Amino acid sequence: MGAARIAPGLALLLCCPVLSSAYALVDADDVMTKEEQIFLLHRAQAQCEKRLKEVLQRPADIMESDKGWASASTSGKPKKEKPSGKLHPESEEDKEVPTGSRPRGRPCLPEWDHILCWPLGAPGEVVAMPCPDYIYDFNHKGHAYRRCDRNGSWELVPGHNRTWANYSECVKFLTNETREREVFDRLGMIYTVGYSVSLASLTVAVLILAYFRRLHCTRNYIHMHLFLSFMLRAVSIFVKDAVLYSGTALDEAERLTEEELRAIAQAPPPPAAAAGYVGCRVAVTFFLYFLATNYYWILVEGLYLHSLIFMAFFSEKKYLWGFTVFGWGLPAIFVAVWVSVRATLANTGCWDLSSGNKKWIIQVPILASIVLNFILFINIVRVLATKLRETNAGRCDTRQQYRKLLKSTLVLMPLFGVHYIVFMATPYTEVSGTLWQVQMHYEMLFNSFQGFFVAIIYCFCNGEVQAEIKKSWSRWTLALDFKRKARSGSSSYSYGPMVSHTSVTNVGPRTGLGLPLSPRLLPAATTNGHPPLPGHTKSGSPALQATPPAVAAPKEDGFLNGSCSGLDEEACAPERPPVLLQEEWETVM
């Protein structure tokens, strides 16, 4: 009863951080292409020029102050301040004249400098504006600075015919230090190696489950769909990175300067639906679809295990079709809706960045699957604890009981994606320094290697899979040994650990070529001179008595192991749920 009472409260407590910051989990792969950066700069320029016209048409407002312009600025409210002398050294004249006694002449006119929309500037003051958020790689917590001289003109750079401005706080992210570069290189290596290892191991796991017919059952079909979703997610990430990250501003961060940003802004605006966007839009769409299908197949695994535990009558074939439509079809619906809305209402850029509230078309279904799957995980762990307590009711070794529960929980965590909630309460935008590095290394490691862990637990460490591989290996080595002995003409051959010294020539009848005659080619046994009916064997006949045990064993063995193939699947379907449930317990325990 204790575990049953604690589990719902624990689920509610842990679901709160899941809902609060799962947005960062889903939206963590945004990247700005150079074309999108140009588009955003031109859009900011158009908005600035429109508001400049509105302000310049009111001369009275210009002579009063910049209050009207401050409210119309697109980049936030400007602030007039005197920064430190290192960045903005004051002239001797400014130092001698107190601020309150300075003449209030004509202010500096607002203008667009191809990076930022500057408001009216009070004469003799330093104007500070927040770094624009439409430049993706800027430090959005910093400020850019300009000085308005006492004559109502923006201060010029000495020796150059251009306006002085200080963007050093904004571009500090564009001049990466060696240590920061090493961190990103290390994260990229973890990211690439993790998804590569997952992709390779999942491919082997799918081939194993598809090759052995005795492993063809509903449980393993669901595992194969889950493995395939992890594989497609990894492939889509590699394709998206190859398409988007080539030619981004981030790749040229160390060479990017303020002048180059102005040059980008002065370039002609790209068309809204350029042909160059087709490839990256397709890559982003498939990435979002396979990301959603991966989350939904993780949910299908939880629903299947939950159904085996709590449903008395469970029709596997009927639910398999439903699970397939749910795992692959439902994500296709809301991704298609998102594509239609984005193409109609926000057909700009490469579609990789969020566009207002339209992002929730994809994020809400994914968040719902994460929350539901976590609730299923808590409920299944509760049942595990109850089962272990009932099994060890007469024993006093509670330490072993808790050890088994911990092991079972750790096995279920990679499948249900429980590791996502560790840093759920600290989104990317709220961490920095050491904590940010710890979070990024943790998420890159577990997210990329999750497919590998799932393949290890549900394929390579599965007892049924290991038994089939051992049987296949024994048959293959036996066939090679038999062929080698037959070619050498030896009088002995081995069958596993048993050695027979029977002559090879006495093994069975031979054909005219000297090869052993297959039992299928031997004449059929006759009854009163007539061959028996197909499928009929007379009771007590030598044929019935001589039937090897291995001929009848597969059906019974398959029934006990829950791995039906062919006609056997129908025969053992009514009794399979308890058997399958026992197998799932064995896998988890």
From Swiss-Prot:
Tell me the GO molecular function terms.
G protein-coupled peptide receptor activity; parathyroid hormone receptor activity; peptide hormone binding; protein homodimerization activity
**Got any disulfides in this one, which pairs?**
C48-C117, C108-C148, C131-C170
What the entry lists under CDD domains is as follows:
7tmB1_PTH1R
Q: Which residues form a coiled coil?
A: none
Gene Ontology CC, one term: plasma membrane
Q: Pfam families, per this entry? A: 7tm_2 (PF00002), HRM (PF02793)
Residue intervals annotated with topology Cytoplasmic: 210-223, 316-318, 382-404, 461-589
Which SUPFAM superfamilies does the record cross-reference, listed alphabetically?
Family A G protein-coupled receptor-like (SSF81321), Hormone receptor domain (SSF111418)
Q: Where in the cell is it found?
A: Cell membrane
Q: Could you name the domain of life of the organism this protein comes from?
A: Eukaryota
Bilayer topology annotation? Multi-pass membrane protein
Q: What is its main location?
A: membrane
Residue ranges annotated as transmembrane are 189-209, 224-244, 295-315, 319-339, 361-381, 405-425, 440-460
What protein family is recorded? Belongs to the G-protein coupled receptor 2 family.
Name of the protein this chain belongs to: Parathyroid hormone/parathyroid hormone-related peptide receptor
Origin species, per record, is Bos taurus (Bovine)
Q: Which gene encodes it?
A: PTH1R
